[in-house]
Amino acid sequence: MREQRPIIALDFPDFDTLKDFLNQFPKDEALYVKIGMELYYAVGPEIVRYVKSLGHSVFLDLKLHDIPNTVKSTMKVLAKMGIDMTTVQAAGGVEMLEAAREGLGDDPILIAVTQLTSTSEEQMREDQNIQTTLTESVLHYAKRTALAKLDGVVCSAHEVEAIKSVTSKDFLCLTPGIRPKGTDIGDQKRVMTPQEAKAIGSDFIVVGRPITQAPDPLAAYHAIKADWNA
């Protein structure tokens, strides 16, 4: 059973901002953090090594989407960093997903992005020319991801039950778009609270601004963690 902790999205522009944020947490507070494209491209692999040296788990969210051989080679590089989780785009197809799994190895969690939580059904149809419902598109990508033997998908909490019904109960569902009650939903169109997401079957949740922009990030994190574990 993989440990399930709320993942903090460290969507910062530079190394110093990240250090200042993490310094607000006790040294023995083991976190699970997400490092996205902005921070990784600004700092490079050093950012992963630094966060791992503090004893934290790292979800490196790069959403790789390229030809299978390139993705496989890139995953081999990421595996050497000691990351705990990373992402690819499900739209890359089964061959690319299988190549990603082979390159990364079996230990780190490998999940695929289905449809971004900022995507509406109208946007999907107009911009991606996918003429199904949003849920049908997500379920299609989830089934293809399971076929490629990845660990799970990134999805809205609203889609978790349906995804597990067409894959398996052990197929991981990581859900962004999580907001504590009474907070601004920002640019996320499909959101839930931590407790609601846990109740519906989410295995991991990702929370950013409600923690990183809180007056007291440590207190905000503990409140969200308590809600998740309630």
Swiss-Prot record:
Gene3D superfamilies from the xrefs?
Answer: Aldolase class I
Subunit note: Homodimer.
Q: Which PANTHER family match?
A: OROTIDINE 5'-PHOSPHATE DECARBOXYLASE (PTHR32119:SF2)
Residues annotated to bind substrate: 11, 34, 61-70, 117, 179, 188, 208-209
Organism the protein comes from: Streptococcus uberis (strain ATCC BAA-854 / 0140J)
- Which pathway or pathways does this protein act in? Pyrimidine metabolism; UMP biosynthesis via de novo pathway; UMP from orotate: step 2/2
Its GO CC terms are: cytosol
What protein name is recorded for this chain? Orotidine 5'-phosphate decarboxylase
What role does this protein play? Catalyzes the decarboxylation of orotidine 5'-monophosphate (OMP) to uridine 5'-monophosphate (UMP).
In the record, the note on similarity to other proteins reads: Belongs to the OMP decarboxylase family. Type 1 subfamily.
Catalyses which reaction(s):
orotidine 5'-phosphate + H(+) = UMP + CO2
